[in-house]
Amino acid sequence: MHHPRARYPPGYTSGGGGGGGGGGGGGRGNGGGGFGGGGGGGGGNHGYYGRGPQPQPQQQHYHHQAQQLHQHQQQQQHAQRNSSSQQQQWLRRDQATAAAASGEVAARTAAQLEAVDSSSEDWKAQLNLPAPDTRYRTEDVTATKGNEFEDYFLKRELLMGIYEKGFERPSPIQEESIPIALTGSDILARAKNGTGKTAAFCIPALEKIDPEKNAIQVVILVPTRELALQTSQVCKELGKYLNIQVMVSTGGTSLKDDIMRLYQPVHLLVGTPGRILDLTRKGICVLKDCSMLVMDEADKLLAPEFQPSIEQLIHFLPANRQLLMFSATFPVTVKDFKEKYLPRPYVINLMDELTLKGITQYYAFVEERQKVHCLNTLFSKLQINQSIIFCNSVNRVELLAKKITELGYSCFYIHAKMLQDHRNRVFHDFRNGACRNLVCTDLFTRGIDIQAVNVVINFDFPKTSETYLHRVGRSGRFGHLGLAVNLITYEDRFNLYRIEQELGTEIKTIPPQIDLAVYCQ
């Protein structure tokens, strides 16, 4: 059924073609550069091989004889057959060789053992692994202790999901938090944006859930609806072999739909604090069996608009609940909350410096009226996979998106005053590469992880170092390289100096030519 609506829904501007899935150019191309890093998917079992060459005729003869022997054994006494097959199956290769009296028996035992060996490794060989990510990575994610995911004794089904998601080995924050979370300890973790924090709590949460138990066992709280959708998607992908039911619940969506969904099994609930508290008070969302509460972007969740809801929500949890708090910044509000609800947490601090190592930061002094012209110059000179452009107000977001479209570049926009359905659609399409550029407010700074974004532009310079940190953290995700360009007016100059001092980082003057190696490897 056709619903009458404007030709271009909110968030979509009418100009420029939109940079197609992987590899297509968009609009006027933003100064070239293949889009989205080329074809990912496909490839099947990279780095893994099949079961080896076909057996030679001699081997086939042995296999045939082994089959005949096995059929002959089946006709013997029941107890004898059980004991002999059990014994033969678990003999090790060296024991089998010693025990074998004839070539036929040795071949039969070897064939059985080969089947046992392959079955123990088969699950890895049969995984549908994505193409390996060969881009350069910084120490933010490579400076690990050398652990593997298998070292944590996770369920095999969870390991399958981890590897198929493209995770190869744990990042530093994952190495620190996964084993501690599995012991049941409370955690207060501070790590940079884009270093794998989401998986650091999703993996232990999925490991601890019992799929046979029809109850909400883990709640993950996040500050924005977009982050809730993204986090739930990560949980679904990592846990796709676990038969765990994941639900998202946020404000701005139908309460009736959430109520109906909660009458079905739900093991893991991801959402914003207000909506989850509302459902809990109504008695629809029952948290008496919830053993783990995760707070992602904890500093934002403890802002005045969220903190009362969170404190009320904690009272619905059992006394022995586990609390995990993750954030890049921990202001005073977090310390007060910690003293009240986390008396003895395990503290993880991986913040020797605040900004990501892979992000190169520049500023350009401009007059307000020159900003659009300056942006046009950046588009023509930079090799942009995808860019996020930040403004300080909703009105300026829409105006700038219109200007960018008039310049001939593909552009979406997103802000908090849009309908939730429109926000979801813009977020989904931008993530899937339908467009090169996204103009937005600070709504989009928290935890949003889009790997193809290699350039962030602060069209309006932020007022606080915390906002700056979260904005530039949208590029250079998971140790890859990124570029942050700040357009600075005369009024912004003191803010620029102050933010440099607070973050202990250097924001350099933009050079006439930017080396591709600093943001495109």
UniProtKB/Swiss-Prot annotation:
Residues 178-348 form the Helicase ATP-binding domain. Signal peptide: none annotated. Residues 13-50 have a biased composition (Gly residues). A motif (DEAD box) lies at residues 296-299. Residues 1-97 are annotated as: Disordered. The lineage of its organism: Eukaryota, Viridiplantae, Streptophyta, Embryophyta, Tracheophyta. ATP-dependent RNA helicase involved in mRNA turnover, and more specifically in mRNA decapping. ATP binds at A191, K192, N193, G194, T195, G196, K197, T198. Residues 51-89 have a biased composition (Low complexity). A motif (Q motif) lies at residues 147-175. Keywords: ATP-binding, Cytoplasm, Helicase, Hydrolase, mRNA processing, mRNA transport, Nucleotide-binding, RNA-binding, Translation regulation, Transport. It is an enzyme of class 3 (hydrolase). It catalyses: ATP + H2O = ADP + phosphate + H(+). Its EC number is 3.6.4.13. This is DEAD-box ATP-dependent RNA helicase 12. The Q motif is unique to and characteristic of the DEAD box family of RNA helicases and controls ATP binding and hydrolysis. It comes from Oryza sativa subsp. japonica. It holds the Pfam family DEAD. GO terms for biological process: mRNA processing; mRNA transport; negative regulation of translation; P-body assembly; stress granule assembly. Its main location: cytoplasm. Residues 358-518 form the Helicase C-terminal domain. GO terms for cellular component: cytoplasmic stress granule; P-body. It is found in: Cytoplasm, P-body. It comes from the Eukaryota. GO terms for molecular function: ATP binding; ATP hydrolysis activity; mRNA binding; RNA helicase activity. Belongs to the DEAD box helicase family. DDX6/DHH1 subfamily.
